[in-house]
């Protein structure tokens, strides 16, 4: 049973994490935090499913995840650990010294992307930071659905039960539950354009160090049509994170 496998994975993961705690106080705090996280996760299963924006965002993250898996740079499990967007982390993919923020847009002005916070595109503490920009056209019954992309990755992990359990657990953390699949079966995505940009010191974005004291939680837009000079090929990008 898939749900039993996922629950077993969650419990096993909790036990492993507790074993690494060096004090009882840390272990108790970790358990309480993890239980709160599980409560939030399972409450999503009782909701009305993902919003259109959330569906689209998850689709984009899965698109990048699929590319990363196929490159074979890391094991399946390690690749899934890199996918931290479901944990509401600052960026969607976090490696040892690199990170990727994924943005999926389906509106008319597909080059206009919203950046949430002054740290999201701040590379100060990283060797490499990238922006994965996916422009899609959403329609009914013409393209790939979110369910299709989920199933594609599940087939990829089918022979690695541990990886499949991690993937399914992360889907639940993202708010994707199989009993909601009917809600997503008619919204399809066709890729209009996908690009990867390297974020360096001259890239047009806000850095935390540039803000005046008292200014925080900034939300701003970038027009990536002006950022062609920062575009890199997929090969260049993936070779740089090996």
Predicted regions and their residues:
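Nucleic-acid endonuclease domains
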Residues: 1-88, 105-242
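Conserved catalytic cores of phosphodiester-cleaving nucleases, focusing on short active-site segments
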Residues: 68, 93-106
């Amino acid at each position: 049973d898939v749900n039993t496998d996922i629950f077993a994975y969650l419990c096993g993961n909790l036990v492993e994490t507790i074993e690494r705690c060096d004090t009882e106080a840390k272990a108790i705090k970790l358990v309480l935090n993890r239980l709160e996280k599980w409560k939030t996760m399972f409450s999503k299963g009782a909701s009305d499913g993902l919003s259109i924006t959330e569906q689209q965002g998850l689709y984009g993250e899965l698109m990048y995840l699929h590319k990363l898996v196929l490159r074979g740079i890391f094991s399946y499990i390690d690749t899934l650990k890199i996918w931290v967007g479901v944990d509401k982390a600052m960026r969607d993919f976090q490696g040892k010294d690199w990170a990727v923020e994924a943005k999926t847009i389906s509106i008319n002005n597909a080059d206009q992307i919203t950046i949430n916070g002054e740290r999201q595109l701040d590379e100060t503490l990283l060797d490499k930071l990238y922006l994965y920009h996916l422009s899609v056209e959403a329609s009914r019954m013409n393209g790939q659905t979110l369910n299709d992309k989920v199933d594609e990755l599940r087939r990829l992990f089918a022979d690695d039960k541990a990886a499949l359990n991690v993937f399914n657990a992360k889907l639940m953390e993202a708010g994707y539950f199989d009993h909601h699949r009917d809600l997503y079966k008619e919204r399809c995505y066709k890729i209009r354009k996908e690009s990867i940009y390297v974020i360096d010191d001259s890239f047009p974005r806000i850095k935390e160090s540039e803000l005046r004291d008292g200014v925080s939680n900034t939300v701003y837009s970038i027009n990536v049509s002006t950022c062609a000079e920062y575009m890199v090929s997929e090969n260049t990008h993936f070779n740089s994170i090996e």
